[in-house]
């Protein structure tokens, strides 16, 4: 394809909102692409199946609860039950359904990466630039792979100020009928509200139960239920 033809296609995609040009003059995916992805997710029923359970956990815990899926090297936020408790606004980060965050420094991203086939996981990590976001961001790819091994063994993921200072979160996997991990649920809190240990020990079981209920709505059954 000639350069002039490619340029015409790019200009057309920009005009339609599927590409946008940043200050560096490099192109990135536009909001229309996110709209397409959200429409596809709506068609699967994932948001509809999860919404009631997310809201129930928000009420029970008084913390913000999120549902996300892996999209390339990012976590795409699919649904969000936002807490209005004092202090939660400090870690809100302006997130909403359709928002994206790097998978490597989020609890949902880590649980989703940990459950990928090994070769696919290595390819994705190879594409990542592990930029420091918070005080404890993992910036070594080997350290990230080691962390993901621990996450897989534990069955849940923890974010200890890896995305931003004072932000704690924990995440659990959502599985479908084929037993594949297709999404993740997480709960986030400011460090002034609860310790990470309390978040894991006191609220972790409720988070896992919520993820299990959503999984059941998607047709997943544990071995002892088959």
Model-derived regions, located:
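Cysteine/selenocysteine-centered motifs that mediate thiol-based redox chemistry or coordinate metal-sulfur cofactors
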Residues: 120-123, 128-129, 208-226
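Short amphipathic alpha-helical/adjacent loop interface patches that line ligand
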Residues: 3, 10, 33, 54, ...
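Amphipathic alpha-helical effector-binding/dimerization core
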Residues: 28-127
């Amino acid at each position: 394809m000639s350069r002039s033809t490619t340029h015409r296609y790019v200009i057309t995609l920009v005009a339609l909102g599927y590409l946008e040009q940043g200050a560096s003059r490099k192109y990135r995916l536009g909001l229309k692409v996110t709209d397409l992805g959200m429409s596809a997710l709506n068609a699967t029923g994932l948001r509809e199946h999860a919404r009631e359970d997310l809201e129930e956990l928000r009420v029970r815990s008084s913390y913000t609860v999120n549902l996300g899926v892996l999209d390339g090297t990012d976590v795409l936020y699919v649904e969000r039950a936002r807490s209005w408790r004092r202090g939660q606004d400090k870690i809100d980060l302006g997130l909403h359904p359709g928002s994206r965050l790097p998978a490597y420094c989020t609890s949902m991203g880590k649980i989703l990466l940990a459950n990928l086939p090994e070769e696919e996981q290595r390819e994705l990590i190879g594409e990542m630039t592990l930029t420091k976001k918070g005080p404890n961001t993992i910036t070594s790819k080997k350290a990230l792979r080691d962390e993901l091994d621990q996450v897989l063994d534990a069955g849940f993921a923890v974010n200890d100020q890896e995305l931003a200072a004072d932000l704690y979160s924990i995440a659990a996997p959502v599985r479908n009928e084929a037993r594949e991990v297709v999404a993740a649920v997480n709960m986030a809190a400011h460090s002034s509200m609860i310790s990470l240990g309390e978040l894991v020990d006191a609220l972790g079981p409720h988070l896992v139960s919520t993820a299990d209920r959503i999984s059941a709505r998607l047709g997943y059954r544990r071995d002892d239920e088959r």
